[in-house]
Structure formats: C-alpha cells, structure tokens
Amino acid sequence: VEDIKAFNQGMNNTTTALDLLKIYEKLAVGNVINSEISKEMVDILKKQKYDDIIPKYLPKSIEVAHKDGWINGVRHDSGIVFLDDNTSYVLVLLSKNFEDEIKGADLLAKVSLEIYNSLL
C-alpha cells in the first residue's frame, strides 16, 4: 500500500499470497473472531464493485467474496469463490510489473476461469 508517511520512516506495507490465503480460509469457515463477524465480513466482500479479475469470466450465478487492489504496476485479487453445490474455494492472485495493467488484469481473470473450470 502506498503509505507515504510509513515509507518515509523506512516502513512499507506488504502481504504475501500465504497471508491472504490464511485470512480467507478462516473467513470461509467462520473463524475470524467468530462466525457472526466472519459472515458480516464475507457479506461486505460479496459487494465488491470492481469485478474485473476473479469473477470477471465466471458464471453470474457464482458468488465471490473478494477484495482487489492496485498500485503502480501491481494488480491483485483474492477471495472466496462460492460454487453452486455449496462448496467454496479460496483464490489469491498477486502480480506485479505488468506493462499493460488492463491486459494483466484480464490475464488474471482468465487464470481464475481456468481454476474454476478445473474444479468442476
């Protein structure tokens, strides 16, 4: 995250795919604080307005609770994909150094679709 005050003090906000995976796995089973709060968080994430990566090519019947992000050359999306059979999976897509961020986001969306199709 571009946090200028932190950066000027030699700090930088970072995450890893594993960090995000662990958070979303806990959310998916209701283990972030408690099941009620986890459900509230998932409901908020289902209202994400930017759907140009994980959900972009998925069938409209598939719900996704996710959070994307972008800063200079970086595109990310991570979340829980809820399948029609009441199962779900966690997907974390992190990238950097795309020359064309729009094409990069579309490539990540295609990766999301491939993963979805492989799990059917």
What is each of the regions a protein language model found here?
Residues 52-85, 89-106:
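Short, Gly/Ser/Thr-enriched beta-strand-loop segments that form substrate-interacting elements
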Residues 13, 85-87, 111:
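Structured catalytic/translocation cores of nucleotide/phosphate-coupled proteins
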Residues 17-70:
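Conserved active-site loop region of the serine DD-peptidase/beta-lactamase
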Residues 22-29, 96, 113-117:
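Short glycine/serine- and small hydrophobic-enriched flexible loop segments
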Residues 10-17, 34-38, 71, 100-108:
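Solvent-exposed, acidic/flexible segments
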Residues 105-120:
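Surface-exposed amphipathic alpha-helical segments
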Residues 1-24:
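Mid-domain, small-residue-enriched loop/turn segments at the edges of structured enzyme/sensor domains
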Residues 8, 29, 99:
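Conserved short-loop catalytic and cofactor-binding motifs
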